[in-house]
Amino acid sequence: ASGVDRRELRKLRRGQYAVGRRLDLHGFTAKPAVAATIRFIEDARQGYRCVAIVHGRGNHSAGRAVLKEDVRALLRSHRAVLAYTDAPRDDGGSGAVYVLLRNRP
């Protein structure tokens, strides 16, 4: 994650940022989930530094964890995302991500 220093990334991994908003994608299919994630990130940038996105682990998908992979691919390329990491185990673990957002210009 370029543009983020080690301390910030460590804080994010440890769940030390207050999660301002949360998006739960359970029950979504791939395209609507990606669209909802884009809207969520854009809206959250209005006043939140850290958000959580619950995409699930893909236990009910045949073959691959579609939502997990698609959401994380989006996060890798979205200009508003400074960094992201698995949520702490007690808040979804690998079935959720904490996202650190860039300050809105």
Where do the PLM segments sit?
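Long, charged, low-complexity intrinsically disordered regions
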Residues: 1-105
